């Protein structure tokens, strides 16, 4: 069964997510804002919307490493070179409070969504 969800943050930015039910309460996300992605939502996750530029992924991993977050899975998807990209980071442990604010200090990061289990 397919589903679609529209989310809006406090700043009014909208993210549309499309996924499918795998049964037993499990889902797989297959699109974010029309871009093909693939993650299950079985872990705590960060969804980072960013400009496709060098150094952004390094910023993300440094922030997480400095806070002792172990990355279980990490995937990068982009619309096209140099345009909007999406980094999905999944972790076994809960993500630290305020990690979204720290990530947004990078001017190439547009939005961060934290999904806790």
Describe every region a protein language model picked out.
Residues 1-117:
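A conserved regulatory-domain signal marking ACT and ACT-like small-molecule sensing domains
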